[in-house]
């Protein structure tokens, strides 16, 4: 229908209905389109991080992933992935490849589909969209279960395709996509490893070769890093004071991924959609939002 309109558009922007959008979002996306980028994900911020400890810890996770994963990969020339909202896709991409995604995480699937053709998903760090985070643990688990199901499904289908395309084209960016789509499996393997490590500490049944490669103290430092990195990000974006209390509860949220991820694996072939209810009706001027002034500073 859009293709038949008299006015033609260079790209599509996709948002969730509950989102708040930074006034300079379109300007930033246009800058990225001018650079020749075709599939772009904006910065996924939170509009209600202080509503509850669940919303707060959920927001911390998104902030950390934005800075430590998406931005980092973009800066070194690797592909990231679409996040379901705050997305910009060039019209020519839709015309050539369509959408045709069937998993519960169709945003991730679309990124992986394009990556097999050598098309990267890039990151617009200053194109900010404020998404509503769920406020209860039950709603959070339900939403994350849907994500886990979709990500496992997507991994099963696209790891072989990415490997074949990456080897055939000799493209490290495509091969790196395997790491992107394999994250739920990494968490699953980490869970199994931790369980056996605890058992082995009391009833030695095997030799841990990881401790032979590097001292246990080094692995402990790596483990501490998962809580140190969010701290660095929170200091950088100047979060509301209440978030610092939620930061103390962040480990609870992190480990709550374990049962969700395990259940997601068992249900990875179930494609029944579960709706996430959003009720937080606020405007840009109604709440204190992080990074509202960042882009103005960057433009000076």
List the model feature ranges, each with a label:
Residues 11-15:
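Short aromatic-hydrophobic micro-motifs that form the base-stacking/packing surface
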Residues 104-110:
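Acidic donor-binding loop at a coil-to-helix junction in glycosyltransferase catalytic cores
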